[in-house]
Amino acid sequence: MKNFEKYIDWMYKRDEKKGEHTLKNIQKLLEAFDNPQDKIKVIHVAGTNGKGSTCNFLSNTLSKTSKVGLFISPFMECMTESITINGVKISEEDFVKYIEMFKPVLEKLDVEGYKNTYFEVLTAIMYKYFYDQKVDVAVVEVGMGGTLDSTNIVKKPIASVIVTISMDHVGILGNTIEEIAMNKAGIIKEGAPIFLYPKDEHLYKLFKGVADSKHAPLYTFSKDEVKVLETSDHENDFDFRNYKNMRTSLVGVHQFYNASLAIMVLDYFKEMFNLNEEIIKEGIFTSHNTGRLELISKSPKILVDGSHNKEAMDALVASLKVFKYKHLILVFSILKDKDYEYAIKELSKITDKFIITTIDNPERAFKLYDLEKEVKKVRDDVVAIADRVEAINYATTIAEADDLILVCGSLYLVRDVIKFVKNK
């Protein structure tokens, strides 16, 4: 659709704001549409790793009995993937209709000094679309942080969910784990229940303090309450509290806990959304999360994962133990504002062939030569191929039948590889 591509370009060209970031711009934008975000039920999900998986567990299960909006980022292939209802993307026609609806207001606000960024416009479209479509509930993933993320314009979600917290977006969200946690805690709202991934005592007290100050009941669980039954390269089996023989097709050791967090939320809302144990069991098992520890090809075996910070990298390395392979061939790239030294060091320990390539993000991506220098601090046998398609082609050429190709380091890289493999 011609207009769709034109408007996508128009959205991308809305430059990032200079100076202090506030919610004032999106507030002005949504006020012009009578604040649709405050007229729908919202489950708001923040955290460093596991947001996407947890959102998918929640939305997929709730959609068994209800009309459920899901907002996630980043998307893998097309911007419309960010806004879905019961798994169906907003159509290109509707997307264009909403941009044309918003455009005059945006242009007026631009002149008044309230310029909304691409992500703020996308967020505003999402809230208005979900309201117009009369969703029963919207599961909304925070873009970055919490306090000043554009999704946090919602005044009172029916629940706030916070997954794992680790050092990511340092300098933007904070320079310590406590500062980053406080930023995520910004989604805790007056009286709205908060569901928390297991935290150490120090961080738990921090979240409890914020929850108490907002009169928000806090629910969490101990990892000891999750009984691992079986792990494999295609499913995880576990018990969580009264929920026995649960299964998830999202693999990786961390998914036991993401799924348990989702189950805790779903159990709380059983009556509101007419759920029972069987529906929850089916919803958890049939959930999918593109680009996160996903086997996208069986011959040759290609595994993709968007891990780019310490905690996610540790989870990836631990999860690889359930995959059977002779040699591990790595296709890797990473943004220079991520913990690249740690990622290179840990991946180098387990990789037989280390191939590096580039990412389509000129401002934040490494130049190939600079990334090569970083890898060579750890190992000499690095293969540098600038073109991402050539890099994955080279990996498939050298891979034998029982080898595993791992593509990781950035969702930008994973996105391009998925697109290439699918088209091939």
Label every PLM stretch briefly.
Residues Q27-D38, K64-K155, L173:
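ATP-dependent carboxylate-amine ligase catalytic core
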Residues A181-E190:
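Membrane-proximal helix-turn-helix segments that form the acceptor-binding/catalytic region
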Residues S410:
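Active-site-proximal loop/hinge segments that shape catalytic or ion-binding/gating pockets
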Residues M1-G47, T54-K64, L70-S73, E107-Y114:
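Short functional linear segments
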Residues D200-Y219, H234, K301-V304, K310, ...:
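C-terminal helical cap/extension that packs against the catalytic core
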Residues L70-P74, Y197-P198, V210-S232, T248-V253, ...:
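Beta-strand->loop->alpha-helix junctions that form or flank phosphate-binding loops
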Residues K39, D132, V137-V142, L148-V161, ...:
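Nucleotide phosphate-binding/pyrophosphate-handling subdomain across enzymes
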Residues C78, L122-I172, K205-N245:
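Extended acidic/charged loop-beta regions that coordinate divalent cations
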